[in-house]
């Protein structure tokens, strides 16, 4: 059935839709399936299934219903682009407080339309949120400023937070795990649970929490510096998340503000993120995106992009989210992914298709991880243009030939090297831990700094 007369209006102007402030705008790359309708017909069916319509006319439709139709307002068939305007009245709101929910946004904009028989593929690349809808989202309650404050740094441009993930990701019992934390904290700032770590039979949750709390106290006493830990509280059950969070805060007591809560936001979903955001508003909310590549990967033509995921995370209230390594680590990505970091940290930023004003909503910190080490960092910082972020290097710290503490120091020295604009090989001559990173990661060293062996003369540990 051709629904383009109802669900498409190419006379609508994007500037007027934005000025009107009553529509969420979404940009998709879409391909119709052969043997069905043409591009505009398929786009209109997509808009219908995403809002008030179905594949047939129904007798219950009235004039009010037609007034909240989603409308295709722009198409570029040559580039497979379609843009759809969704009236904000379509989106579900909480009964308890009238707030918006990402679950509803996803259900409409990326729900049934992903399985339509006449669509070969469709993927969301950007979306725009008008002020009237933006203000209904929680946004972050804490930011990197709160971590900088705990670390005793300035809350403006407080700088690089040196972090790690304890490796191996699974298989350590509570005390060996805590010992690894202590070792890293002698040189670094921030440790996170790897996303599968929780309450395994060989590492009971409460035993691990107690051991890490003791390691933090000892590391702080030894170094005279504050330390940070991000605990995974992800669970299927809302009450389990609350129980984990409350036990952690009770155990860390005076160090409770040194604790972030990690939630696997993609696999556990918006409900888990919002549970943590609302139940623990004083804690830094660490959004881990494990599993996201199933839909965000450039190889996937359905779903949405990592840019869209990160933008949604800011709306939900994530204090920080993993944003990949922009092509400098082991995960998929490219240098242009820095647009993700800009969108979640700035008060106004341009996406692939839309300009977004955040109207003072707190920023979300880029958390960089995935195959990073000290040698890759100067180029990464060059690409991004600043170092006000958290980096969690697992292998990059514990793969250092001199251990976790030296690995942490090498990461910090890498940022110092970049800030000074120094040649990394020359800088390494006076910074032992950074120099030993060349020996720790020789394949990276050979690729990035081909002359390093002659200048640094590798030595046995």
From Swiss-Prot:
Classification via SUPFAM superfamilies: RuBisCo, C-terminal domain, RuBisCO, large subunit, small (N-terminal) domain
Family matches, as InterPro entries: RuBisCO, RuBisCo_large_chain_AS, RuBisCO_lsu_C, RuBisCO_lsu_C_sf, RuBisCO_lsu_fd_N, RuBisCO_lsu_N_sf, RuBisCO_lsuII
CDD domains: RuBisCO_large_II
The record's free-text note on cofactor binding: Binds 1 Mg(2+) ion per subunit.
UniProt-annotated binding residues for substrate: 112, 169, 289, 322, 369
UniProt site (Transition state stabilizer): 330
Protein origin, superkingdom: Bacteria
An individual GO BP term: reductive pentose-phosphate cycle
Residues modified to N6-carboxylysine: 192
Cofactor(s) required for function per UniProt: Mg(2+)
Single GO MF annotation: monooxygenase activity
Catalytic activity: 2 (2R)-3-phosphoglycerate + 2 H(+) = D-ribulose 1,5-bisphosphate + CO2 + H2O; D-ribulose 1,5-bisphosphate + O2 = 2-phosphoglycolate + (2R)-3-phosphoglycerate + 2 H(+)
Binding site for Mg(2+): 192, 194-195
Enzyme Commission number: 4.1.1.39
Keyword terms, alphabetized: Calvin cycle, Carbon dioxide fixation, Lyase, Magnesium, Metal-binding, Monooxygenase, Oxidoreductase, Photosynthesis
Active site, per annotation: 167 (proton acceptor), 288 (proton acceptor)
Keyword Magnesium: yes
UniProt xrefs under NCBIfam families: PRK13475.1
Family as reported in the entry's similarity comment: Belongs to the RuBisCO large chain family. Type II subfamily.
HAMAP family: RuBisCO_L_type2
Quaternary organization: Homodimer.
Miscellaneous notes: The basic functional RuBisCO is composed of a large chain homodimer in a 'head-to-tail' conformation. In contrast to form I RuBisCO, the form II RuBisCO are composed solely of large subunits.
Function per UniProt: RuBisCO catalyzes two reactions: the carboxylation of D-ribulose 1,5-bisphosphate, the primary event in carbon dioxide fixation, as well as the oxidative fragmentation of the pentose substrate. Both reactions occur simultaneously and in competition at the same active site.
Protein name, as recorded: Ribulose bisphosphate carboxylase
Species name: Rhodopseudomonas palustris (strain ATCC BAA-98 / CGA009)
Organism classification: Bacteria, Pseudomonadati, Pseudomonadota, Alphaproteobacteria, Hyphomicrobiales
């Amino acid at each position: 059935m051709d629904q383009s007369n109802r669900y498409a209006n190419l006379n609508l102007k994007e500037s007027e839709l934005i000025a009107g402030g009553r529509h969420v705008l979404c940009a998709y790359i879409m391909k119709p399936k052969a043997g069905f309708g043409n591009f505009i017909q398929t786009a209109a069916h997509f808009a219908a299934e995403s809002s008030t319509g179905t594949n047939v006319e129904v007798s219950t439709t009235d004039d009010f219903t037609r007034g909240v139709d989603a409308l295709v307002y722009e198409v570029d068939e040559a580039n497979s682009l379609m843009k759809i305007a969704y009236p904000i009245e379509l989106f579900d709101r909480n009964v308890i407080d009238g707030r918006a929910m990402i679950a509803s946004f996803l259900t409409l904009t990326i729900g049934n339309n992903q399985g339509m028989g006449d669509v070969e593929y469709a993927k969301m690349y950007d979306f725009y949120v008008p002020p009237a809808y933006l203000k209904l989202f929680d946004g972050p309650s804490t930011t990197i400023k709160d971590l900088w404050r705990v670390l005793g740094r300035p809350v403006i441009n407080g700088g690089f937070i040196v972090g790690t993930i304890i490796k191996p990701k699974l298989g350590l019992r509570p005390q060996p795990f805590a010992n690894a934390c202590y070792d890293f904290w002698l040189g670094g700032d921030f440790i996170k649970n790897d996303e599968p770590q929780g309450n395994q039979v060989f590492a009971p949750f409460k035993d691990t929490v107690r051991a890490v709390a003791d390691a933090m106290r000892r590391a702080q006493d030894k170094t005279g510096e504050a330390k940070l830990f991000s605990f995974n509280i992800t669970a299927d059950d809302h009450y389990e998340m609350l129980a984990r969070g409350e036990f952690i805060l009770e155990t860390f007591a005076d160090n409770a503000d040194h604790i972030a809560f990690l939630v696997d936001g993609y696999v556990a979903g918006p409900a888990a993120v919002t549970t943590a955001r609302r139940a623990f508003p004083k804690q830094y909310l660490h959004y881990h995106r494990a599993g996201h590549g199933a839909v965000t990967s450039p190889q996937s033509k359905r779903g949405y992009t990592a840019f869209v995921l990160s933008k949604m995370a800011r709306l939900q209230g994530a204090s920080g989210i993993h944003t990949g390594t922009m092509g400098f680590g082991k995960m998929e990505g490219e240098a242009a992914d820095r647009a993700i970091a800009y969108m979640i940290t700035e008060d106004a930023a341009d996406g692939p298709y839309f300009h977004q004003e955040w109207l003072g909503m707190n920023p979300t910190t880029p958390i960089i991880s995935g195959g990073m080490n000290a040698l890759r960092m100067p180029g990464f910082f060059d690409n991004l243009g600043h170092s006000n972020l958290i980096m969690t290097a697992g292998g990059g710290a514990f793969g250092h030939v001199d251990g976790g503490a030296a690995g942490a120091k090498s990461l910090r020295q890498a940022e110092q090297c970049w800030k000074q604009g120094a040649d990394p090989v020359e800088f390494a001559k006076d910074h032992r831990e950074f120099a030993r990173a060349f020996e720790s990661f020789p394949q990276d060293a050979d690729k990035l700094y081909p002359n390093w062996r002659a200048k640094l003369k590798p030595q046995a540990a």
